Amino acid sequence: MQGASDTNSWYDCYRGLRNKLNLEGTEMGEITLVTDFFDIGRGQDKNEELRRTASKYFDEFRRWARIQNKLIVYTDSKSAETIKAIRAEYGLLDKTVIVATDNLFELEGDLLARMEKASRNQDFLDFRYLPEASSNNPKYDYLWMMKYYFMNDAYEKGLLTEDVVWMDFGFDHGGITYSDEKDYDFLWNYDFNGKIHISCLYDPDARIGMETLQFQNDCVMGCMYGLS
């Protein structure tokens, strides 16, 4: 785990780079952001440390929702109204596209059924080190997988610009790294080089694959990764 000094140093670098890369008026294309929100009951999680209510997610979203890029949100019809209201607070409703999805668990129903079956397998339960981890919840794993489904769906619907970035709805958990929410108040432009970019917390090859699978150590953050 990084120490506080490492985090602060990284944060200072981020702010400096952001100021250099946010070159409005250049030929760089605007980045389209894609996210999703579905209440799968994490507010009732047995582990209090992992518990995240819908209200908490909306508060976390409100911090970064001021970013001025076009934002595509996959969510249910009820949550859509709250999300639109939050973006409207920053005058960004016209740059917000809601894709109402009220049949989340029917989109890949066969896959969800297989995940649920695996989650009940005793060998699976005995193997996992943390029995109450979110990743043991088939609905959580299904929703995680749907990030890629939604990115592809947005592409097929013609909603994306040339550059697209996924942002987790609850990104940064309310200010763990980016303590000043005003740091999100900018239009993000960046000249991606045509590759998929994924930010890793550590070298994934530095640990044994089976160990990572059992302990579910975080390696890839579900935020700010993009492609062009």
Predicted segment positions?
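GT-A fold catalytic core of metal-dependent nucleotide-sugar glycosyltransferases
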Residues: L143-H197
